[in-house]
UniProtKB/Swiss-Prot annotation:
Residues 134-345 form the DCUN1 domain. One of its GO terms (biological process) is protein catabolic process. Keywords: Nucleus, Ubl conjugation pathway. It comes from Caenorhabditis briggsae. This is Defective in cullin neddylation protein 1. The lineage of its organism: Eukaryota, Metazoa, Ecdysozoa, Nematoda, Chromadorea. GO terms for molecular function: cullin family protein binding; ubiquitin binding; ubiquitin conjugating enzyme binding; ubiquitin-like protein binding. The gene is dcn-1. It comes from the Eukaryota.
Length: 367
């Protein structure tokens, strides 16, 4: 990234002698912005547009066609004074080339969070600005390295191969990045990848190496705090990924495990929620013990997390206030969450809001 700090004093004296450049609209914006910033530094304020468009010698732009850039119809005409830092940060997080990064930032009006969302939603949006760098044969060869006969899954990566993959990536099994990896690859089964899932996932990230894969997954993880939509998408994916194929709901222990993976260190409300669920399980077991006897009662799992509860719990824990003062009792919440709120207000001294002053949930981040 040192090239981004290179000398900004371009050869103004030779400007009229150089042949005219063919610039993309986004490249034109940045060159104009840099020229205007330089002009401000030396006290020049009355330069015309033709005088202020100066070559950028320290950004290694690949030549890009106007056809490729035509995919963006909202390229920004104004870039901030700290645009170099924004561009550098975007390149570092996404590992995208500078021309591609520039186009995404311009399309997002230099809002880096929005630009990253655009990039991960469609990394090939400006693919014509830079050639694809993924080697399919390398990806298949990489997949083959992690197929382990001990798993007995044929041409699939199984638990043994997955363990080696995580070691090479430097991830612990309970690391959220492991779940993000499964989400990006659209994996259907825990601890397994099919060849199609692996190759499609690598292609979507535009990588064909372990190092490249780690950089992209790390960047996605870092961006989760700023992009709650992606965090919710990850959470919704986890329900199907975590439950058994034969079940319609998620086992309580599995649900708690994945909540810890997604949300990290437990905040008080999360801890109280989990304690409440364990309490529900104990009460259910006591009833089953009376009806079926101790031996048979242990064979029955009495508390399950339904899809509705799982999905809406994200809204509850992320978007709601920690004191539950904005909880709408008339809202379409699952019964289990209603019961938890009643428990908090009756047994844990949570405030009981006035109904006439109850407000809709305000946006706030759990993280």
């Amino acid at each position: 990234m040192n090239r981004l700090k290179a000398d900004q004093k371009t050869k103004v004296g030779k400007r009229k002698q150089d042949p005219p450049e063919t610039l993309s609209e986004a490249e034109y914006d940045v060159k104009k912005c840099r020229a205007q910033n330089n002009a401000n530094l030396v006290g020049v304020s009355n330069m015309t547009s033709s005088q202020t468009v100066m070559p950028i010698t320290h950004l290694s732009y690949a030549s890009s066609s106007s056809q490729g850039l035509a995919q963006s119809s909202i390229l920004s005409k104004n870039c901030p004074k700290n645009y170099e830092n924004i561009l550098r940060q975007f390149v570092q997080w996404t590992q995208a080339t500078e021309p591609v990064s520039l186009n995404f930032l311009a399309k997002a009006n230099w809002n880096i969070e929005y630009a990253m969302t655009l990039y991960y939603d469609n990394p090939n949006l400006f693919s014509s600005s830079a050639p694809a760098t993924v080697d399919q044969s390398k990806t298949i060869q990489l997949f083959t390295q992690y197929v382990d006969k001990r798993d007995g899954l044929g041409e699939r990566i199984g638990p043994h191969g997955m363990q080696r993959l995580l070691i090479d990536l430097g991830y612990e099994p309970i690391d959220r990045r492991v779940l993000i990896l499964a989400w990006v690859f659209k994996a259907e089964t825990q601890c397994e990848f099919s060849l199609q899932e692996f190759t499609n996932g690598m292609a979507s990230l535009q990588v064909d190496s372990i190092q490249g894969l780690k950089q992209k997954i790390d960047a996605l993880d870092a961006g989760m705090k700023a992009d709650l939509t992606k965090t919710r998408d990850l959470c919704i994916f986890t329900f199907n990924y975590g439950k058994s194929a034969a079940s319609r709901s998620l086992d309580l222990e599995m649900a708690i495990c994945y909540w810890d993976v997604i949300f990290g260190a437990r905040k008080p409300l999360m801890s109280q929620w989990i304690d409440f669920l364990y309490g529900q399980e104990r009460m259910a077991y006591a009833r089953l013990e009376e009806e079926l006897g101790p031996t048979n009662a242990k064979k029955v799992k009495s508390v399950w997390i339904t899809r509705d509860t799982w999905n809406l719990f994200w809204d509850f824990i992320v978007l709601g206030k920690e004191d539950l003062s904005d909880y709408d009792e008339e809202g379409a919440w699952p019964v289990l969450i209603d019961q938890f709120v009643d428990h908090c207000r009756e047994n844990l001294n949570y405030p009981k809001p006035l109904r006439e002053n109850s407000n809709a949930m305000e946006h706030q981040s759990y993280y």
